[in-house]
Amino acid sequence: SLQAATEWLKANNQRGFLGEMGAGSNAD
């Protein structure tokens, strides 16, 4: 459960971080 959450965070932080950077730049 904890390991799955860690792997999920790793995958989603990479996509989410890049997504927020791109979307944030475009939005602003």
From Swiss-Prot:
Entry EC number(s): 3.2.1.4
GO molecular function: cellulase activity
Origin: domain of life: Eukaryota
Compartment list: Cell membrane
List of catalytic residues: 20 (nucleophile)
A biological-process GO annotation: cellulose catabolic process
Catalytic reaction equation(s): Endohydrolysis of (1->4)-beta-D-glucosidic linkages in cellulose, lichenin and cereal beta-D-glucans
Membrane topology: Lipid-anchor
Keywords: Carbohydrate metabolism, Cell membrane, Cellulose degradation, Glycosidase, Hydrolase, Lipoprotein, Membrane, Polysaccharide degradation, Zymogen
Keyword Cell membrane assigned: yes
One GO CC term on file: plasma membrane
Record-stated family: Belongs to the glycosyl hydrolase 5 (cellulase A) family.
Protein name, entry field: Endoglucanase
Organism: Schizophyllum commune (Split gill fungus)
Taxonomic lineage of the native organism: Eukaryota, Fungi, Dikarya, Basidiomycota, Agaricomycotina
